[in-house]
Design a protein with these regions (language model features):
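Sec-dependent bacterial lipoprotein signal peptides
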Residues: 1-22
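Extracellular beta-strand-rich recognition modules
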Residues: 45, 122-143, 151-155, 214-228, ...
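Short beta-strands within extracellular/lumenal beta-sheet-rich domains
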Residues: 114-134, 198-203, 240
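Surface-exposed intrinsically disordered loops and tails
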Residues: 68-88, 170-196
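Terminal, low-complexity interaction segments
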Residues: 176-248
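Extracellular glycan-recognition surfaces and repeat-rich motifs
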Residues: 44-104
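Extracellular ligand-binding interfaces
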Residues: 133-185
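Bacterial Sec-dependent N-terminal signal peptides
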Residues: 17-48, 247
Length: 248
């Protein structure tokens, strides 16, 4: 190969290499250009360990406290023996599930011991929340109703803390009560009592000091029953499923 051809070949090789490097660089930049993740969030409670890893937290402040807290559902077909005491076999099958009818969050009267004031919380991960956003969830007690149940929904409007106080009379940083299901512990059918079939509840968020600017907050589900527990005349079991936070 003469010198002229050699120089021409080298020039072409340099141009080709420059184009190839430029192309690879452009591909790399394109791969990093992704849309921001949605602020909305859906939880199916198919695995409580995964849920805990996601930032959910159970806090049991029942008095006296029992051996259980919020946990994975434990549905057993025709399971309950009809009286209070153990072992506990749940009559609640999940609202929706892929592999098991126990794919929901669940709590029962063993959150307390003896005659107990049940005060057992399940708190969401941080949610980037603003006024006008929506939370929804499905809940039920067992059918038929043997012992009435109650659940409250609270909002922490000022921070992202898990602080729910230390006693049944306190709610800590969760100062906004969004919902109280069956506050009078009625044994009758919903809407007076607690729903005994899966029922959807939807809440529009309002009153946040940050207005329409998303900030980190948490929502707390509170199993809250006076004179409950294994020795009580009220409290049985409730399920929570298909939680949605919808950013508007």
């Amino acid at each position: 190969m003469n010198k002229r051809n050699l120089l021409l070949f080298g020039f072409v090789l340099i141009i080709f290499s420059s184009v190839l490097i430029s192309s690879c660089g452009e591909d790399k930049v394109t791969a990093k250009s992704t849309q921001p993740a949605s602020l909305s969030y859906h939880e199916e409670f198919d695995s409580m360990q995964r849920v805990i890893d996601m930032g959910w937290k159970g806090v049991n402040l029942s008095d006296p406290i029992g051996s259980q807290s919020w946990q994975q559902g434990s549905y057993v077909v025709n399971g309950l023996n009809g009286t209070k005491g153990g072992p506990f076999e749940s009559r609640i099958a999940s609202h929706s599930y892929k592999a098991s009818a126990s794919e929901h969050a669940y709590v029962n009267y063993f959150a307390g011991e003896g005659l107990s004031f049940l005060n057992c919380w399940l708190i969401t991960p941080e949610l980037s929340m603003k006024n006008g956003d929506i939370i929804s969830f499905w809940t039920t007690t067992a059918d038929p109703v043997s012992f009435p149940d109650r659940m409250q929904v609270w909002l922490n409007p000022t921070s992202n803390s898990y602080n729910v106080g230390r006693t049944s009379a306190e709610t800590g940083d969760f100062t906004v009560k969004l919902l109280d299901i069956n506050p009078n512990l009625s044994p009758t059918a919903y809407p007076v009592g607690y729903p005994s079939t899966w029922t959807k509840f939807e809440i529009v968020i309002s009153g946040l000091p940050n207005g329409t600017i998303p900030q980190k907050h948490r929502v707390g589900f509170r199993y809250y029953v006076k004179d409950g527990g294994p020795g009580g005349t009220v409290s049985d079991e409730i399920g929570l499923d298909d939680f949605d936070f919808i950013s508007q």
